[in-house]
């Protein structure tokens, strides 16, 4: 059972499932200045991933891991248990065979973009923006926002190495309804997971989108997250 810990998460593989959880307060780590690293949107991102996996699994034919359990633990950490997806990451497939997989991803991406909303939803991918900024819950009279994975790298596409079939697309914590330009095709390169967060300069349309968020709109929310996917889905059901 492989396991590892980062500055904000603990991960563990079991025989048939996978655990991704936030660190409990007693596990918080210190940075080089000796200050505790506290990720304010950490649990919200996992809650968003759980809601997204349920939604995508119910509404599309895109292969995603089934959520076994998601919720807060008694020690203050947030746990997300999912089924284990068999296979290897796309980055381990020979370049000569990757076109077969990429064709499947493009079809799934088209399916995602068929899911639309008039409201932005999901944690922001621009983590380097100031945490104390006032964020706008941006609305549109037309359903112009499409569902985006927002971290569709080769590491997040799990493939059967024999059949080259996509067995699962994982790591949906940044997913939500956004402009099409948010879902950059990192699966066509070797950029690692989280590349979109670290490479905002690679996506100039995003900068233009964020620049208009200074205009007063319908509602304001403070902090690193906008609306969770579950909030939007509940609103869609009520309408």
Explain the meaning of each model-derived region.
Residues 74, 88, 126, 133, ...:
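Short, surface-exposed, charged/polar-biased interaction segments
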Residues 142-148, 153, 160-218:
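Active-site Asp-x-Gly
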Residues 44-48, 97-104, 140, 149, ...:
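Soluble or luminal CAZymes and related metallo-dependent hydrolases
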Residues 11-12, 158-160:
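Well-ordered beta-strand positions
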Residues 72-73, 101-150, 160-165:
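An alpha-helical support segment within catalytic cores of ATP-dependent transferases
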Residues 1-33, 112, 116-120, 146, ...:
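Phosphate/pyrophosphate-binding loops and the adjoining catalytic core of nucleotide-dependent enzymes
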Residues 2-124:
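ATP-binding pocket architecture of kinase catalytic cores
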Residues 5-6, 132-134, 154-155:
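A generic local structural motif
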